[in-house]
């Protein structure tokens, strides 16, 4: 079930504050976050985030096509290693 339109997108307050502060100072340093649930908003375009995937931080550069998605969608948590090939 999707989120109600009257509520608007969810973005953690601390993350939104960091983005707004960096926009005011016109800085583009990477923002480290554990908030995979936060929605990408238009004011985040052009910023680089380091999103935690449970083990390490993966770098995500936000572009216009990512608006409306969540940060966690671009930081996969499961890595599939192929099944071994039987020799013989």
From Swiss-Prot:
Where are the annotated coiled coils located?
Answer: none
Q: Could you say which protein family the record assigns here?
A: Belongs to the universal ribosomal protein uS19 family.
Q: Do you know which InterPro entries this protein is assigned to? A: Ribosomal_uS19, Ribosomal_uS19_bac-type, Ribosomal_uS19_CS, Ribosomal_uS19_SF
Q: Which controlled-vocabulary keywords does the entry list?
A: Ribonucleoprotein, Ribosomal protein, RNA-binding, rRNA-binding
> What protein name is recorded for this chain?
Small ribosomal subunit protein uS19
Q: Which Pfam families match?
A: Ribosomal_S19 (PF00203)
Listed under GO biological process in this entry are: ribosomal small subunit assembly; translation
Q: What does this protein do?
A: Protein S19 forms a complex with S13 that binds strongly to the 16S ribosomal RNA.
